[in-house]
Amino acid sequence: MRHAESAQPGSVFLFSSRKVLLMSRFCITSVMHCLIAVVALVSSGFLQAAEQKRPNVVIIMTDNHGEWTLGCYGNKDIKTPHIDQLAQEGTLFTRAFANNAVCSPTRATFLTGLMPCQHGVHCYLRPRIQTGPDSYNTLEEFQTIPQILHDAGYVCGLSGKWHLGDNLYPQEGFSYWITKPHGASSGFYDQEVIEDEKIHKEPTYLTDLWTQHGIKFIKQNQDKPFFLFLAYNGPYGLGSAMKEPIKNRFKEEYEQLTFPSFPREKAQPWNFNYGDWIGDLGIIRKYAAEVSGVDDGVGQIMQTLKELGLRENTLVIFTADQGLSGGHSGYWGMGDHTRPLTAFDWTLTIPLIFSQPGQIVEGARQNMMVANYDVYPTLLNYLGLADKIPAKPARPGRNFAPVLKGKQIPWKEEVFYEFENVRAVRTPEWKFIERYHESPNELYHLTRDSKEHNNLIDDAQYKQKKDELKQELDQFFARYADPKWDIWNGGQSKTVLMTQKLFPKTYLYLPEPKKK
């Protein structure tokens, strides 16, 4: 009994201890679950806060558009108050350059950060690659800006010109998609557009249409991070689109002006098909009206951002695919409207403006030389996505995001250019142009000869400078060219070449067809 009696308290003790132990375990487990939930909520909050702090992105790209047409770049004839205001609210680059003369290669470079000898898009895409039976996305193997932003949680929308293949279907992370079946513009009214994977005739003035869809996309996605690629097909400046009468709101005013900002220089012998447009007031007025039409669209986009309270949290970039000569140096058009193909400044120079209130220096004019291939690393660094830049293929672009914040960084003043059989390197004072299986090569002292009329390539006193620049050019392409797409060394091209006869070993690359 004594043992029994003595055992009873022990049993009670063991039972109580077990109960306490079980209760303790339950409490600890509950506390741990609570802590995990709290940590998850806090982490989620931090992630949401981080996502909210990452700005929306609006990239506005125009087509065949020289920076010289804008008031903020000194033009006194053409009305561009909204783009001028954007420049006042951000940083304008006075020396920004395209790396090619035509639409598809420059757009491919802008979105990938790669040169044509790396991405394979050497000339503009013909219809068969855009909506025909052989259509495919020429950028599908690369990490592009929209694809990276999509993967980072952005909703991505395209309104306007694509011209990079398989136009009928949304590409590269875009979910909102309205575009043109082809790259070239035969006009701005009653044109075919692609919407909901179908082609239809659109009566709306195309510049207004792209703006309207840009606004629609912003409003639909105002509560989440978004990326809008607003790619106008104006001002364009070429073909039948310039023969079309002015119909936008600048018609009456512009038909009375003479636009002295368009040079009336003697047409140079290398003009291929537009030399007689120099000084043609009908063409000049139409081009000017289309520039101002784009400016109206920019104003509407900016007003929408402000009305929705999104302006401070939206990075806006304004640029063009490549420049255009409106008579400068005796040419009209781009570097593909000459024979031989050329690399003159009027085809390279483009507008470039970055703006985000409170984040980017306002009213700054930055004179450093930058190229369109520099935008890729700059944008991704600015957004905190530098770790998403692929290590391969190596990209030639440099990050100038600190400059947007007002900081000084080391910077080599040079840019590179590649258009089929033409490669060039440009510094502040010099430009060296080399041609593959064609002549002449060219050397210009730009500070003395800004119109690039006096070729010094055979001048003995500049041989050392020529050799230095040639070495720079050769080293650049030796470092970055991908043998698969390097047409100077037997590579392929995703586009038909204008200079195909010079590249007998190069053929049009077409991938295996895919089911759609």
PLM regions with names:
Residues 18-19, 50-55, 62, 66-67, ...:
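Long, internal low-complexity/basic segments
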Residues 59-62, 66-157, 176-190, 381:
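Active-site segment of extracytoplasmic enzymes that catalyze sulfate/phosphate-ester chemistry
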Residues 54-66, 85-86, 110, 149, ...:
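Beta-strand elements within well-structured catalytic alpha/beta cores of enzymes
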